[in-house]
């Protein structure tokens, strides 16, 4: 699991509303006239971490944050296990979902999107289609993912991509792998639209270390959180 529990620095603010339709989302109202943001979670969906993260972005200056639930049509996980999450995830048709997501983003006037893991893969596709100007992907999959309706493999189009996007990964991400990390580094060096940040000593899902007793790991997680927040909110 990338993350489950919300760290103490995330507010325990309840959502202020919800949206139901082709795209379902929880709404978190901010106190400012800042940008409208959208959060794409990992395969476990809208758990406590992502609800807290959406509330955190609203508190930090977003006008409103929409936490999208890609798996709303399939119901909650009966058991929160990796196997159950993957079984549900494979029911999602990635390409069709992202097409609906793009229409939703346009209709909701979203100005920034952040995605984690699977959601990070979706962010690459949003960058390819030049959907919004503020894009952040945490530990995404530039090598692509298998699916019954797969998206194009990011490695195939990243060299020519012109839409700037921020990618934040750990140098010890076993799901990304060393070869894929090196390939991503090479593409980022050749294309300044790829704003790549590599967190030293961090693995997949490193924001789970925000409250780690290991001060070095916690510092890396806080730096990664800060990079993404600054990109989304400006500054």
Swiss-Prot record:
**Pathway membership, UniProt:** Aromatic compound metabolism; 3-chlorocatechol degradation
What other comment is given for this protein? Carboxymethylenebutenolidase is specific for dienelactone and has no activity toward enol-lactones.
Report the sequence similarity comment from the record.
Answer: Belongs to the dienelactone hydrolase family.
Q: What class of enzyme is it?
A: hydrolase
Protein's GO biological process: catabolic process
Its domain of life reads Bacteria
One of the Pfam families matching this protein, by short name: DLH
Question: Which species expresses this protein natively?
Answer: Cupriavidus pinatubonensis (strain JMP 134 / LMG 1197)
Q: Which key words tag this protein in UniProt?
A: Aromatic hydrocarbons catabolism, Hydrolase, Plasmid, Serine esterase
Residues the record marks as active site: 117, 173, 204
What's the name of the protein? Carboxymethylenebutenolidase 2
- EC number annotated for this UniProt entry: 3.1.1.45
InterPro entries referenced in this protein's UniProt entry, alphabetically: AB_hydrolase_fold (IPR029058), Dienelactn_hydro (IPR002925), Dienelactone_hydrolase-like (IPR051049)
The subunit field of the Swiss-Prot or TrEMBL record says: Monomer.
- Role this protein plays: Ring cleavage of cyclic ester dienelactone to produce maleylacetate.
Q: Which reaction does it catalyse?
A: 2-(5-oxo-2,5-dihydrofuran-2-ylidene)acetate + H2O = 4-oxohex-2-enedioate + H(+)
């Amino acid at each position: 699991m990338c993350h489950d529990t919300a760290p103490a620095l995330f507010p325990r603010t309840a959502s202020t509303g919800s949206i139901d339709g082709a795209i379902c989302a929880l709404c978190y109202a901010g106190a400012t006239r800042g940008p409208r943001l959208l959060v794409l979670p990992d395969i476990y969906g809208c758990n406590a971490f992502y609800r807290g993260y959406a509330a955190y972005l609203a508190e930090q200056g977003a006008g409103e944050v929409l936490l999208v639930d890609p798996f709303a049509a399939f119901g909650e996980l009966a058991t929160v296990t990796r196997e159950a999450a993957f079984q549900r995830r494979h029911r999602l048709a990635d390409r069709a979902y992202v097409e609906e997501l793009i229409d939703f983003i346009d209709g909701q006037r979203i100005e920034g999107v952040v995605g984690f893991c699977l959601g990070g893969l979706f962010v690459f596709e949003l960058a390819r289609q030049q959907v919004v100007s503020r894009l952040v992907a945490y530990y995404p999959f530039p090598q692509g993912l298998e699916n019954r309706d797969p998206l194009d493999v990011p490695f195939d189009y990243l060299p020519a991509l012109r839409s700037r996007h921020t990618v934040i990964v750990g140098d010890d991400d076993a799901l990304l792998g060393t070869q894929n990390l090196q390939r991503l580094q090479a593409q980022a060096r050749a294309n300044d639209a790829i704003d790549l940040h590599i967190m030293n000593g961090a693995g997949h899902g490193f924001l789970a270390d925000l409250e780690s007793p290991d001060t070095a790991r916690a510092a890396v997680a806080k730096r990664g959180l800060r990079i993404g927040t600054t990109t989304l909110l400006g500054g």
